[in-house]
Amino acid sequence: MFDIGFGELLLVMVLGLIVLGPERLPVAVRTVASWIRTLRSLASTVQNELSQELKLQEFQESLKKVEKASLQNLSPELKASMDELKDAAEAMKRGYTETPSPQKSDDPKKSGDHSATVEPQSNIPLNDPEAAYDGVIEAETAVRPADSQQKPENAAVAENHNDGRHATSDEAVGNNNVKPEQSQPSAASARQPSDSR
């Protein structure tokens, strides 16, 4: 490794014995041996990691070559569909990155093309999508509790109408063991069919 012959090694040992003495020489030899062992293990670790990285890079290059070869061997129909998908993806990206321009006419009758002025709301990019989402949730929760309270009552009334008897809403509620709540009428109760007597 260091091109040290037997004579040179013997000379180093004699000098070490003279300088360090017989008591400290074995400790110094063990320390130097542990340093050499650590350096060798470090060198082998670095060498192994480099060889693994080179193998991985070669493997990735071979995969890229195979992928390119398989893409070149595709049928024209598949290539056309892939190109269409890429174009659609790019168009969607452009649609979300561009801001809407205020070039619309105020009066759709003047423009002559009514289809150009009507856009579906889902294609308009939102500046604050959470605000729009919160509004939907609030509207749904405002309607749903009233609907859920009215459904058992409506079902019981409908059953009694089908039997030929006319039942009041108190009887219908009593049949379902549901106590009526005293609350303000909601939009759902306004849609309820009225009971004709």
Swiss-Prot record:
Residues 180-197 have a biased composition (Low complexity). Disulfide bonds: none annotated. Signal peptide: none annotated. It is found in: Cell inner membrane. The chain crosses the membrane at residues 1-21. InterPro entries: TatB. Keywords: Cell inner membrane, Cell membrane, Membrane, Protein transport, Translocation, Transmembrane, Transmembrane helix, Transport. GO terms for biological process: protein transport by the Tat complex. It is a single-pass membrane protein. Residues 104-113, 160-169 have a biased composition (Basic and acidic residues). GO terms for molecular function: protein transmembrane transporter activity. The keyword tRNA processing does not apply. Gene3D superfamilies: 1.20.5.3310. GO terms for cellular component: TAT protein transport complex. Residues 93-197 are annotated as: Disordered. It comes from the Bacteria. The Tat system comprises two distinct complexes: a TatABC complex, containing multiple copies of TatA, TatB and TatC subunits, and a separate TatA complex, containing only TatA subunits. Substrates initially bind to the TatABC complex, which probably triggers association of the separate TatA complex to form the active translocon. Part of the twin-arginine translocation (Tat) system that transports large folded proteins containing a characteristic twin-arginine motif in their signal peptide across membranes. Together with TatC, TatB is part of a receptor directly interacting with Tat signal peptides. TatB may form an oligomeric binding site that transiently accommodates folded Tat precursor proteins before their translocation. NCBIfam families: tatB. Belongs to the TatB family. This is Sec-independent protein translocase protein TatB.
